[in-house]
């Protein structure tokens, strides 16, 4: 299932997600203040972001010519992080027209790793690094 062209994913080879559960109970939670380094060389505190925002969180993105971790495809939901980023890229203007103020990707990879990915995939939004797991521990 390994895909070589990570900037133009073959969606037919990405496993379909299982039905999502109702997550409405999460609306009562507030994001705590944590500064996360972004690919546009700024620190972002998600607790201070105003307006409608999308934060998509993913485990990792692959890099060309580098193998994924062993058994990566066996982890439910692990496959598809790069296509997910591409989908937000491809629908960026639509989301902006729907009054989405901010879009952020977020992973535990380093900012340098993420910068390579944002440049290669031509992402029009910043990706945030939680390398120290400060956001994840909330």
Task: Give the location of each predicted region.
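Chalcogenol-based redox active-site neighborhoods
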Residues: 1-138
């Amino acid at each position: 299932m390994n895909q070589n062209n990570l900037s133009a994913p073959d969606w037919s080879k990405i496993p379909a997600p299982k039905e999502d559960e109702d997550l409405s109970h999460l609306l009562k939670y507030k994001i705590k203040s944590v500064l996360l380094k972004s690919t546009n060389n700024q620190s972002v505190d998600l607790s201070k972001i105003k307006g409608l925002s999308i934060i998509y969180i993913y485990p990792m993105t692959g890099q060309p010519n580098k193998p994924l971790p062993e058994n990566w495809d066996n982890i439910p939901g692990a496959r598809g992080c790069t296509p997910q980023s591409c989908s937000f890229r491809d629908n960026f203007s639509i989301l902006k027209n729907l009054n989405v103020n901010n879009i952020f990707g977020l992973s535990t990879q380093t900012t340098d790793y993420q910068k390579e990915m944002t440049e290669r995939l031509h992402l029009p939004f910043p990706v945030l690094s939680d390398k120290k797991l400060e956001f994840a521990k909330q």
